[in-house]
Amino acid sequence: MKKQNNLRSLAAQAVEQVVEQGQSLSNVLPPLQQKVADKDKALLQELCFGVLRTLSQLEWLINKLMSRPMTGKQRTVHYLIMVGFYQLLYTRVPPHAALAETVEGAVSIKRPQLKGLINGVLRQFQRQQETLLNEFATSDARFLHPGWLVKRLQNAYPTQWQHIIEANNQRPPMWLRVNRTHHTRDGWLGLLEDAGMKGYPHPDYPDAVRLETPAPVHALPGFAEGWVTVQDASAQKCVAFLAPQNGEHILDLCAAPGGKTTHILEAAPEADVLAVDVDEQRLSRIYDNLKRLGMKATVKQGDGRYPAQWCDEQQFDRILLDAPCSATGVIRRHPDIKWLRRDRDIAELAKLQAEILDTVWPRLKPGGTLVYATCSVLPEENSAQINAFLQRTPDAALSETGTPDQPGQQNLPGAEEGDGFFYAKLIKK
């Protein structure tokens, strides 16, 4: 492998772009993976996800072992040392190889003069590892979450916040949704077994399958033909609450990448579905999913706050609003969220959610159903949001989900092995 494609230096650059520049790992990682051999892609992904998952600990260690922070053009070395710590703590990479490759990464980022520094810090960590980890275990950094988020979770869930944090720090299972228009779930599980893999049906979600071991999608029976889709079990519950019917006019708002759009059409193949998302670049993901599953829907770019951008005065039988949110329920799947979000974002997101709810509600027919969903665990975006909406919207009533005192249903991360999700089913009187 060429030196400029040193895995450790690429991982360091990816983490730096997330933490320092506010870019999402899903945007940063794919171009970097193109620079390494296929056999190395999984390790590069593991290093990036792992460092972001444990960033608080790795930062704490650097502060203990270095007298001053690295700044300016040397900042990438800061993250390269983190990659070294992560390998020594959490991977099966032999320590000598972890050190050698991490030190060599300095050459790839054109900082060869710092090889000795990197080597010295990593070896010092090896010598002091037990003492350092014992001290870390009593520090605030041990939660592996930013302090503002820990405080919000403590306030919202006084008896459950530690369980939420522990779930967020775990690796997520791989959930699939079997396309019922092609196969029964049991039938597809048989095909999976024939392919040498094992899956488990979810007891409550009729299309959901959890893989015993995560696998690349191209290895899944019939993935290219649309027999199965990658989607967390908790996300599949949105369409169960929506209960779409054939012949209905249905709006999927904030629809990208299209997982719920296609789920609606699997449940009601003859429904007339309009999928709308504000991000024009992500519309291609909706088209790709529709094409792979052999389905048709109308797809438009538009802001949920301005319905005139994407439809005329028509009303819908059902609306699924998967609202823009903090994504604090899917941290285990996207650990970069911890470092991309800021405390001030929550109030801004809650304001945006309220605006979308208020402007889309008139587009729902009397007697129609609106399902409001987020992948957040914060009450400001969930139960408090719906409570405020019900108070200012006389023709809205809660159905199936929660009580007037606690509107909506909150799934916490790890519950039934799913992501953290919130749902509120509203009926228009």
From Swiss-Prot:
Protein location: Cytoplasm
Reaction equations catalysed: cytidine(967) in 16S rRNA + S-adenosyl-L-methionine = 5-methylcytidine(967) in 16S rRNA + S-adenosyl-L-homocysteine + H(+)
Binding residues annotated for S-adenosyl-L-methionine, in chain numbering: 254-260, 277, 303, 322
Molecular function terms from GO: RNA binding; rRNA (cytosine-C5-)-methyltransferase activity
Residues annotated as the enzyme's active site: 375 (nucleophile)
Domain of life: Bacteria
A GO-annotated cellular component: cytosol
Entry's EC annotation: 2.1.1.176
CDD domains cross-referenced by the UniProt entry: AdoMet_MTases, Methyltransferase_Sun
Record-level GO BP terms: regulation of DNA-templated transcription; rRNA base methylation
EC class: transferase
Keywords for this protein: Cytoplasm, Methyltransferase, RNA-binding, rRNA processing, S-adenosyl-L-methionine, Transferase
Disulfide bonds: none
PANTHER family reported in the protein's UniProt record: NOL1_NOP2_SUN FAMILY PROTEIN _ ANTITERMINATION NUSB DOMAIN-CONTAINING PROTEIN, NOP2 YEAST -RELATED NOL1/NOP2/FMU SUN DOMAIN-CONTAINING
Function in brief: Specifically methylates the cytosine at position 967 (m5C967) of 16S rRNA.
Name the record gives this protein: Ribosomal RNA small subunit methyltransferase B
Classification of source organism: Bacteria, Pseudomonadati, Pseudomonadota, Gammaproteobacteria, Enterobacterales
Gene that encodes it: rsmB
